[in-house]
Amino acid sequence: MKKWTKTALLTGCACCIAGAVLMFSGWASGGKAYAETYDLNAMSGSAKKEDGISTQEKIKLDDFDELQADLTIGDLNILPSGDDSCYLAWRIPSKKGETAVEYRVRDGVLSIEETSAVSDTIYINIDFTEENLSGGKQSETGVILYVPEKKVLKKIEVTMGFGDVQMNGIHAESGRLQNADGDITLFGCDMQNIKCKADYGDVELKSGTWENGSITLEDGDAKIQNTKLSGDVSVENSYGDIELELGKKDLERLEITAKTDFGEIDVPDTMENLMQKEEDEQSFSYVPDQPAGRITLMTKDGDISLEND
């Protein structure tokens, strides 16, 4: 081994040991409590996290039948309210803890958007260290909208910047879901005529219904599980996999077209004879006697999986 290589390795090992010692010393002398209380992103060592967080406890809203949400930082969760009313709450980083969200209900439309206290702030997050120092505890930020379980939204328009979208038991007749950097997850939702787009993130539909509409991904995976599909449905992906997992009867009642430019297609044994392969490209087509709907699955670089449970 060359002398300089040995010296570099020894120096690296020494730095790792020194770093571990310093980290343990910081944790033992109260670093855990500090990481839980103070803002690691602030220039001041005395700045507390809550000083830079805009918090709104659950507040009751007027009734509405359309939603427009435009958010940049944090997650958006839409959940059942448990009663006949709608509520809104949030916890979002903002300048000096100023109000981060503006909302209003006008002509049956609920609009939710961030204020300048968020958009005028450059937020560089180093809180990845917080999870290690605080024993796995990490603050969640975002907006939570609560709606009645049986409420049907005529239209839903959601535009996200950096954060995840999660909806539980939501009913919508039309709309658009768009996320620049984050996942979109729908549990037990009944959706019609929805255009869903994720630039960098996954899309998952589970235990609901999806009638007409499209799902488009640039870099992420799409998973549709135990979801009743009808009408014309398309899933297009640039870099990522597509997984369709339905009951045997539900899968066999769909007209299915699948194609991948660079990847593999995995189908149930009873459909293997419908596969077509040509170098890296694979395709699949299935047409039942009386289709309940049509789904098109396309990915440029990724695998496609069809499963019947």
PLM features: residue spans?
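Internal hydrophobic scaffold segments of catalytic domains
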Residues: 15-20, 93-110, 248-249, 255-257
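Right-handed parallel beta-helix
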Residues: 52-66, 75-83, 96-192, 197, ...
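Short, flexible beta-strand-to-coil junctions
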Residues: 71-72, 91-95
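Detector for the N-terminal beta1/A-loop initiation region of ABC nucleotide-binding domains
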Residues: 72, 199, 238
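Short Gly/aromatic-enriched secondary-structure transition segments
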Residues: 83-93
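Short, hydrophobic/aromatic-rich segments at coil-to-beta transitions
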Residues: 87, 154-156, 230-231
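Short, surface-exposed interaction patches in beta-rich subdomains
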Residues: 187-188, 193-194, 203-309
